[in-house]
Amino acid sequence: MSITTPANPTDAVRLVTTEDAPWADTGTGVLLKVVRFDSSHGTWVILNRFQPGVQLQTHRHTGSVDAFTSAGRWHDLEYDFYVTEGSYLYEPANSVHTLHVPAENTGDTDVCFIIEGALLNLAEDGSVESVSDGPGTLEAYYALLEAQGDPRPNGLIV
């Protein structure tokens, strides 16, 4: 058996040690780490740490989302179930929801999101108020780290 090294280094297996990457503080009770951004497929992988009581703007996904919760609990206001530590949630394209972390949580809630496409952040009337996507999130992550005085992490897969 032989092992071939890919001609394109971006095709190689990559390991990211997320503990080595700094959290970017958004100032809204949400901490962020960008782990991967693939511009050719529109896929982005982020880690979020939500403080108790955080609520995100209602949004629509243009693609599917996979969510893995490693600590805490959260829910979408539109549904009657909670996503808890050890849970996996699939959100199909075009789903609309409002992520909420209960204020009575006793600690932070950590979630890894694998996102295809963009989030369309909606105004109360349902119109698109803003767009969150991989390129914009990566740019914001770098800007927040710079403002905090933290270096860009090594090993980020872009």
Q: Residue spans of the language-model regions?
A:
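Short glycine/proline-enriched turns and hinge-like loops at secondary-structure junctions
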Residues: 42-43, 60-62, 81-82, 103-104
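Glycine- and charge-enriched low-complexity intrinsically disordered segments
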Residues: 126-145
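Conserved short histidine dyad/triad with adjacent acidic residue
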Residues: 29, 34-36, 42-60, 92-96
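Short, well-ordered beta-strand segments in beta-rich or mixed alpha/beta enzyme
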Residues: 47-50, 69-74, 99, 111-113
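A short, N-terminal "cap"/entry segment at the start of jelly-roll beta-barrel domains
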Residues: 1-42, 135-136, 145-158
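Glycine- and acidic-residue-biased ligand/ion/polar-headgroup-sensing regions
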Residues: 52, 61-78, 84
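Short acidic-glycine-tyrosine-enriched beta hairpin
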Residues: 39, 77-97
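Ligand-binding loop in jelly-roll beta-barrel domains
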Residues: 93-124
